[in-house]
Regions:
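Glycine-rich phosphate-binding loop of ATP-dependent small-molecule kinases
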Residues: 1-223
Length: 223
């Protein structure tokens, strides 16, 4: 959702994490190249390597939310003639669930957050952007047009979250009216998820250990 605090959550939650192990990708409107592929292609391209943390600011869920509110945008996607209507969204839910299941089976832990800001607070944040010179650049007049479709978006979000919250990739709906609370809840969930991975330091082989002992002796013999 616009003005839900996605950028600030990423900034504050990841403070202190070694940036060498993190990548952040923001998804906007698909490029002409991306429109020449299926809707999950650009997501696959942006996935992190094993051992790294990947953060998606927006994602493939735009394809079952924004496009459901604006079905006319589908015309740019060069889709087959069928299916359209409700069947299309059901098929995309299936595709997303299968895609995320595939990632989970291959070692990618998926944690999904929906930052749920109220309509009142969204309005306050839009006005605050307009009032502050350092934030006005973040305001987009088109966001007000989308705000007029609030009920349609809420319906699309509800359908998508219900259909795609799975044991391997559950949704976490986070209240987003108070940023400190939003960020604290995200941190708690991420800490629990990382601890559940039961990570450990890389094992040192016996051969490496012997080489390390020899290196230690050489260091200790140095004047």
């Amino acid at each position: 959702m616009d003005a839900a605090g996605k950028d600030s959550a990423i900034e504050h939650v990841m403070t202190g994490v070694n940036p060498q192990g993190v990548q952040v990708v923001g998804f906007r409107s698909p490029s002409p190249e991306e429109l020449d592929h299926d809707f999950l292609w650009r997501i696959s391209k942006a996935l992190p390597e094993r051992g790294r943390i990947g953060i998606f600011n927006r994602s493939h869920y735009e394809e079952v939310v924004a496009l459901r509110v604006h079905p006319e945008w589908l015309e740019r996607q060069k889709l087959p003639s069928a299916p359209r209507g409700p069947a299309l969204w059901e098929e995309r839910y299936e595709d997303i669930n299968a895609f995320e299941r595939h990632l989970d089976r291959n070692g990618t832990k998926i944690v999904k957050f929906f930052l749920h800001v109220s309509k009142t607070v969204q309005k306050e944040r839009f006005l605050a952007r307009l009032d502050q010179p350092g934030k006005e650049w973040k305001f987009n007049a088109a966001d007000v047009d989308e705000r007029a479709l609030w009920d349609e978006y809420m319906s699309a979000f509800e359908s998508a979250l219900t259909a795609t919250s799975t044991p391997w990739a559950p949704w976490h709906v986070i209240p987003a009216d108070h940023k400190w609370l939003t960020q604290a809840l995200i941190v708690r969930i991420l800490v629990d998820a990382i601890q559940a991975l039961d990570l450990s330091w890389p094992e040192v082989t016996e051969q490496d250990r012997q080489a390390n002992l020899e290196a230690r002796k050489r260091l200790e013999l140095e004047p």
